[in-house]
Amino acid sequence: MKTLGEFIVEKQLDFSHATGELTALLSAIKLGAKIIHRDINKAGLVDILGASGVSNIQGEDQMKLDLFANEKLKAALKARGEVAGIASEEEDDIVIFDGGRAENAKYVVLMDPLDGSSNIDVNVSVGTIFSIYRRITPFGTPITEEDFLQPGTKQVAAGYVVYGSSTMLVYTTGYGVHAFTYDPSLGVFCLSHEKVRYPATGCMYSINEGNYIKFPLGVKKYIKYCQEQDEATKRPYTSRYIGSLVADFHRNLLKGGIYIYPSTASHPQGKLRLLYECNPMAFLAEQAGGKATDGVNRILDIVPEKLHQRAPFFVGTKSMVEDAEGFIAKFPDEEAK
C-alpha cells in the first residue's frame, strides 16, 4: 500500500531540480481535504448546513459549508508558506498571503472549495477543485491578478477531491492522472488508481436536460443523437446527471462519458467558472486521454480576462466531445433564432 505522501515524494525524486515546494503545497491541500471530509460527515449534527445569508460576487447565495471549506483550505495553504496567495470562487478578489515566506513563494492556487454544495443537505456527493500555477510577478513583491489570469496550459498541477461513499483525491502534475482513496482508520490517502485513463468509448452523457429549451440548437441535436437507437455505436446512451461537477466528472472519467454545461439563453457565456472549474478539469481530462472544449475552442488555450470568467464546458471521452463539437459546427446558433 502506497500513501499519497509517499507517492508524491517518489515522483519528486524523478526530477533532480525539484525543490519540494510543490510537494509541501499538495500536502497542505491534502490536510484541508481531511478537515473538510471530517466535517462534511457530521454536517447534519452541527450548524453548518443551509445558506449563510450572504452572496458571492456573482450574486449567488453562499452555503455555510462553502465558507467553511474556503476558510479551512485557505488556512492550510497559508500555514505552509509555499503559496503567495489564492483566488477562490468564494472570494471577490485575490487573497494575498503576507509575511513569512509567502512573498517569495513560487506558486498561486485557484480553487472551488466545495463544488455542488447545494447537494450536501440531501447527502449527495460534493467535491473540492484546485489548480496550481507558478507566479509571474517577481519574488519579494506582492502578487497581482496577473499571476492568476493565465491560460490553463500554464497549470503546474490540478486536481479534485470527491466526498462520496468514500473520499478520493485525484490529481495530475502533467504526468498522468492518479487517484487516492482516504482510509479514515489510518488518516491517510492510499493509492487506488494509478495512471487513470478514459475508456476508449463512452456510453453516458451528463447534462441538465431541464434546461433543454434554453440550449443552442447544436446541443439539442446532440442530445437527440445520444437518445437514438443504434447498435453500431451502442446508443442510446445512458443519461446520468448528479448536479455536482466533481461527481459527474469522476464517474465519466472511470466509466466513459461526456459532461456538458453549455451556454444557455439565461447564461450566454456559460455558467461554470473557467479558472476554478473548467481549467483544472480540462487539465485532468487531457492527461487521462480525454478532451475539453467550450464547444469550439480548447479550454486550456483560453486566455482569461477576469477572475470569475465563465465558459461553456464540454469534457470527457475524446470521441464523445468531438461528436458534440460536430453537431455544434453543423447546427450553429443562428439557425436556432
UniProtKB/Swiss-Prot annotation:
Pfam families named among the record's database cross-references: FBPase (PF00316), FBPase_C (PF18913)
Entry's Gene Ontology BP terms: fructose 1,6-bisphosphate metabolic process; fructose 6-phosphate metabolic process; fructose metabolic process; gluconeogenesis; sucrose biosynthetic process
Gene3D superfamilies, alphabetized: 3.40.190.80, Fructose-1,6-Bisphosphatase, subunit A, domain 1
Pathway: Carbohydrate biosynthesis; gluconeogenesis
Compartments in which it is found: Cytoplasm
Keyword Cytoplasm applies: yes
Catalysed reactions, semicolon-separated: beta-D-fructose 1,6-bisphosphate + H2O = beta-D-fructose 6-phosphate + phosphate
Cofactor(s) in the UniProt record: Mg(2+)
InterPro entries: FBPase_C_dom (IPR044015), FBPase_class-1 (IPR000146), FBPase_N (IPR033391), FBPtase (IPR028343), Fructose_bisphosphatase_AS (IPR020548)
Coiled-coil region list: none
Single GO molecular function: fructose 1,6-bisphosphate 1-phosphatase activity
Keyword line: Carbohydrate metabolism, Cytoplasm, Hydrolase, Magnesium, Metal-binding
GO cellular component terms listed in the entry, alphabetical order: cytosol
Chain positions recorded as Mg(2+) 1 binding sites: E89, D112, L114
Enzyme class: hydrolase
Binding site for Mg(2+) 2: D112, D115, E277
Cofactor: how bound: Binds 2 magnesium ions per subunit.
EC number: 3.1.3.11
Binding site for substrate: D115, G116, S117, S118, N208, Y241, K271
Family classification: Belongs to the FBPase class 1 family.
NCBIfam families associated with the record: PRK09293.1-1
This protein's name: Fructose-1,6-bisphosphatase class 1
Organism: Yersinia pestis (strain Pestoides F)
